[in-house]
């Protein structure tokens, strides 16, 4: 792994990379994100068989995503973000993609809960590289006024991946369970859920060489000349704390909602309306592919539109306005008397719930020096995921087990968690707007 060929910062007046080159990088990052969503999401369709295989309750299953994935994802973010600010980001992403794909496949070999827990840790550590390094790369391919849409396109790959994982994963599990393919020699002795891990982990290996082949972009803007010592990065954060603290706290509400919905909605439909994995996959997957995908891109589009109107705090206002309705629709959806009505409300909840992701990435890149961007992005991911992946999935499980005392009452747990979060985000992001505007006025 070497320093970027053009490690010196690029003067602001130098030409930006071509749009074609920039969007090629967006496409590769999006494909890697789709693969990562498959690897992390397909387990949500395996609640029943995984709990049965390892004799788990809802709390312990929630820990597979909340602790094994969420906590270790965030623990790895900052060290990997540090590497991404010092070395070539294409090598960071390519190597991590190789590792997380292998760990995803190894999840199917787990014979104990501890082994499965550790393989999910490996997936989390690998996937923690993609967003910090990816955001940093995009900020060196697109000028600030045009950064929102590429960020939105990158972020829309997350609901695309989740949607495809629900649809494809549900169909895959159904096929593995009913077709007799599990009697074939390579799969004999394994359960369908184990074979599914082997299959969904493999495609990531095909993308690895492509990242090694792309060109590393020149680092642009303030702070791009040489790697920053850790103390200077700390200074960057502390000097911007009046904006960053409420920003990060507000954006932490987004994964609380998204992971609670992604992990527990399949169980909601199975327990409440007796849907099988294929039905769940098609129902939720199509909503993710349509509403979730459009919402993620809409956040980037709205940010660029607000920016063109002269709003220096455009990313924050776009996120706050978009997410405000998520709590309403998402809180009501689990309480509906029929599955059809629940899906009808879940669609706009996913649209609005995915809006802030591109806004957050854009907001950070616009006020942070170049050689600190991946690290500050990693800090952002650490904070939001400690509140999100480590709290959302586990709290829903804990409330179901210990507050309502009935697995059928998961609808109330999910509704409460979703409904409480969106007004908190709105208040915190509005509080961050004034100090953020001051930073935008001096960032470049």
Name the predicted role of every residue range.
Residues 43-44, 242-297, 354-357, 361, ...:
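Extracytoplasmic gate region of multi-pass secondary transporters
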Residues 75-113:
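Conserved MFS/SLC helix-loop-helix module at the cytosolic interface between two early adjacent transmembrane helices
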Residues 55, 88, 109-115, 126, ...:
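Helix-breaking motifs and short loop linkers at transmembrane-helix boundaries and internal kinks
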Residues 119-159:
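Cytoplasmic helix-loop-helix junction between adjacent transmembrane helices
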Residues 11-18, 216-248, 272:
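Juxtamembrane intracellular "pre-TM" segments in multi-pass secondary transporters
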Residues 66-80, 286-299:
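Central cavity-lining transmembrane alpha-helices of secondary-active solute carriers
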Residues 44-75:
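Extracellular/periplasmic helix-loop-helix junction of adjacent transmembrane segments
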Residues 154, 158-212:
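Helix-loop-helix hairpin linking two adjacent transmembrane segments in secondary transporters
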């Amino acid at each position: 792994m070497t320093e970027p060929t053009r490690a010196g910062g690029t003067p602001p007046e130098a030409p930006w990379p071509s749009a074609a080159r920039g969007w090629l990088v967006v496409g590769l990052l999006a494909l890697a994100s789709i693969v990562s969503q498959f690897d992390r999401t397909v387990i949500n369709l395996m609640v029943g068989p995984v709990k049965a295989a390892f004799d788990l309750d809802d709390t312990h299953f929630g820990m597979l995503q909340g602790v094994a994935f969420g906590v270790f994802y965030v623990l790895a973010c900052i060290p990997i973000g540090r590497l991404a600010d010092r070395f070539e980001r294409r090598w960071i992403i390519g190597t991590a993609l190789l590792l997380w794909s292998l760990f995803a496949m190894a999840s199917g070999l787990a014979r104990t809960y501890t082994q499965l827990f550790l393989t999910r840790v490996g997936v989390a550590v690998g996937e923690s590289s993609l967003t910090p390094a990816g955001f940093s790369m995009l900020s060196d391919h697109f000028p600030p006024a045009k950064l929102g849409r590429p960020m939105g396109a990158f972020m829309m790959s997350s609901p695309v991946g989740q949607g495809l994982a629900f649809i494809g994963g549900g169909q895959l599990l159904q096929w593995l369970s009913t077709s007799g393919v599990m009697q074939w020699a390579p799969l004999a002795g394994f359960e369908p859920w184990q074979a599914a891990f082997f299959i969904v982990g493999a495609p990531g290996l095909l993308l690895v060489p492509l990242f090694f082949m792309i060109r590393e972009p020149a680092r642009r803007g303030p702070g791009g000349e040489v790697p920053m010592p850790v103390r200077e990065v700390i200074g960057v954060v502390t000097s911007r704390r009046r904006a960053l603290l409420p920003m990060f706290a507000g954006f932490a509400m987004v994964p609380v909602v998204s992971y609670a919905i992604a992990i527990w909605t399949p169980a909601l439909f199975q327990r409440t309306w007796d849907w099988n994995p294929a039905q769940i996959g098609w129902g939720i997957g199509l909503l993710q592919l349509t509403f979730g995908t459009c919402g993620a891109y809409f956040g980037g589009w709205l940010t660029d539109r607000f920016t063109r109107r002269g709003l220096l705090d455009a990313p924050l206002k776009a996120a706050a306005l978009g997410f405000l309705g998520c709590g309403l629709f998402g809180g009501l959806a689990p309480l509906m008397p029929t599955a059809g009505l629940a899906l009808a409300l879940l669609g706009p909840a996913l649209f609005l719930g995915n809006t802030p992701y591109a806004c957050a990435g854009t907001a950070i890149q616009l006020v942070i020096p170049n050689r600190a961007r991946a690290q500050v992005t990693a800090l952002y991911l650490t904070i939001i995921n400690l509140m999100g992946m480590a709290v959302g999935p586990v709290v829903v499980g804990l409330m179901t087990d210990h507050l309502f005392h009935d697995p059928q009452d998961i609808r109330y747990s999910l509704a409460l968690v979703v409904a409480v979060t969106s007004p908190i985000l709105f208040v915190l992001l509005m509080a961050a707007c004034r100090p953020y505007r001051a930073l935008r006025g001096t960032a470049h």
